[in-house]
Amino acid sequence: MRRSGEDVFGGAGLSGIEVQYVEELFDGANRVGVGGHEFLPATADAAGVASLEGVPHQLLLADAETAKDVLTFLGRATRISDEGVRLQAARGVLALTGAALAPHGLFDQTPTVLAMRVVQVDPELECDVVVSSLTATDDDSALTLPETGLSPAWAGVAPPRGHWQPTSTLAASVIARRAQWGISAVARGATPGSGEEAVRALRAAIWGEPDEDLGGLPRGVAFAADAFGFISGEEDVPVMQSGRWTRLAFRRGHVLARGPVAAGLTAVRGTGSAQ
């Protein structure tokens, strides 16, 4: 049985078929099925809410620790935004994706930065839904889905299925330091009485800015790694690229950022600038 903390996107503890499935996950949301039978929830309303009536309402996970892992990821995601977590499952693998940062509206310059973690699930479960909550049950290894799902815009922006090319590595300590710098900058800039739009613009400016210490990636990748608990001790984090997307493969999960194609990413030194 795979431990829930292992690196699965890179292949640790998974068969070749499972790895291939994980890299083909990003294709369509709001589908749920069991045993090969697919169910389609109702179309989302104007508020982005989709009914899950008539679909299986339980996730059967590998064990109690995996269920706790899923709830922890969801809890971290809900502290960041109210746009839920995407659950994509098939072939015994469940990928959880949350948006650390995502634009709201045409002129919002916030980058799309996603966090992903993968765990084992009931091999017969097939699903692709976005939910804002999951509920523990009498079975420690099972979680109950809510009655309704969500349809956030970020869930329709799919990372590529494959062709990830290694470009560099980043020291986890540097990523952590840049995250703390950004958090402090947001706190300093958000004056009392700042409106929602002003705070959003401030966050977009700070987290969306390319950071030299992160190889030119938006500083938001550091925020995502910190907020979702992916940084743990010393680690050289592989950086991979596919088209407009960049992926940071931590041992605890993955951060994916969408933006202009970055050329010439190089390994970053172990010390960061104070800025």
Model-found features: residue ranges?
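Residue-level detector of functional hotspots within protein domains
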Residues: 5, 11, 71-73, 80-82, ...
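N-terminal ordered "arm"
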Residues: 50-111
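Short amphipathic beta-strand/extended segments with alternating polar/hydrophobic composition
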Residues: 13-17, 97-99, 105-117, 255-263
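A sequence-level detector of short, solvent-exposed, charge-rich linear segments
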Residues: 38-44, 89-93, 115, 169, ...
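Long, compositionally biased intrinsically disordered terminal regions
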Residues: 3, 9, 131-275
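A broadly used, surface-exposed interaction patch
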Residues: 105-142
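Actinobacteria-biased recognition of intrinsically disordered, low-complexity terminal regions
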Residues: 1-60, 65-68, 256-275
